[in-house]
Amino acid sequence: MVSCGQSPEEYNIATVAWTGTICSDPPMCYISLRKERHSHSIISRTREFVLNLTTEKLAKQTDWCGVKSGKNVNKFKEMNLTAIKAPNINAPMIEESPLCIECRVVEIKELGSHD
């Protein structure tokens, strides 16, 4: 799950299937989001997000966050997930995630259906 936003009122979670490592030195990863996704506009503006790894225990939340829009619901509240302050960026981490990776956007590559 990818979390983003600058303040609790804006916090959102997107379920992202297309992600991975693209460089080890310097460490860099990627996510691929449809332009229509609510999180796309937040991340494009704030230039930061958190990759929150999931477990089997988070399967329901991961699925639900992938089919609901953050424009209409507070995903943290609806799924009983806890937003916690990230040490280095404003985007929140998901406390229930076993591993959270803070990310700053270096480049947005426009690629048709996804960026």
Which residues make up each language-model segment?
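Active-site-proximal mixed secondary-structure blocks
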Residues: 1-15, 20-115
